[in-house]
């Protein structure tokens, strides 16, 4: 082991990217595709419903908003009923909380896989026997997490801007996606330092995600401050 606490970080970073290049690519492509396809599918559904009713998509959106604003189950599962009579507000309601939960899961699994899971498999011990510092592994996986979330946030913003959404709001939404992912990556990094086994660290991180979802659900249904405590709020 090197005396330099961060020695070998670059090599470990390249190793993580080589091992996870397919997984991370699939995660990012899947999320960005979901984010990009949803507006088009929503618009098609609204247009079809408007054609059946002989009205406009805006009127259908307003009708559905009136129903959803009083539906506690939908609010608990999907998020606050803000601006549901607008296309952007309806999109955030339909997929916002769900997407953030997936982003959180991606980050939790990434951190656990390259920390405690590596130690349990014995690969971490082999790496540490070389000229690698004690903080190199955590630093390398943290860099990967930051880069992954930045790419996701940027991709999300680009998709929204390409769809004709407001540039400022698109950037804000992409930033919120990236920051939520980084928060759960940080939570996972804390738990892998507390617990010896990867499953325990992953379990506690997922428990944190469940608590965040529950706080958001209760806060949104009751329209109170609890949702402000949740990174999914």
Language-model segments: residues:
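Aromatic- and glycine-rich beta-strand/loop motifs that create alpha-glucan
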Residues: 1-32, 197
């Amino acid at each position: 082991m090197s005396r330099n606490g961060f020695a070998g970080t670059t090599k470990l970073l390249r190793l993580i990217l080589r091992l996870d290049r397919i997984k991370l690519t699939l995660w990012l492509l899947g999320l960005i595709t979901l984010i990009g396809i949803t507006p088009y599918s929503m618009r098609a559904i609204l247009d079809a419903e408007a054609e059946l009713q002989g009205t406009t998509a805006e009127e259908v959106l307003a009708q559905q908003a009136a129903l959803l604003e009083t539906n506690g189950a939908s609010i608990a599962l999907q998020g606050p009923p803000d601006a549901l009579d607008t296309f952007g507000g309806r999109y955030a309601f339909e997929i916002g909380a769900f997407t953030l939960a997936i982003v959180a899961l991606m980050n939790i699994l990434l951190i656990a896989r390259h920390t405690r899971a590596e130690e349990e498999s014995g690969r971490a011990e082999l790496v540490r026997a070389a000229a690698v510092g004690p903080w190199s592994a955590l630093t390398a996986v943290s860099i990967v997490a930051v880069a992954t979330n930045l790419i996701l946030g940027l991709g999300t913003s680009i998709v929204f801007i390409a769809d004709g959404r407001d540039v400022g709001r698109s950037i804000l939404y992409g930033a919120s996606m990236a920051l939520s992912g980084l928060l759960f990556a940080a939570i996972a990094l804390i738990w892998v330092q507390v617990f010896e086994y990867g499953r325990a660290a992953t379990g506690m991180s997922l428990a944190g995600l469940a608590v965040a979802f529950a706080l958001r659900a209760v806060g949104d249904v009751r329209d109170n401050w609890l949702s402000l405590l949740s990174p999914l709020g």
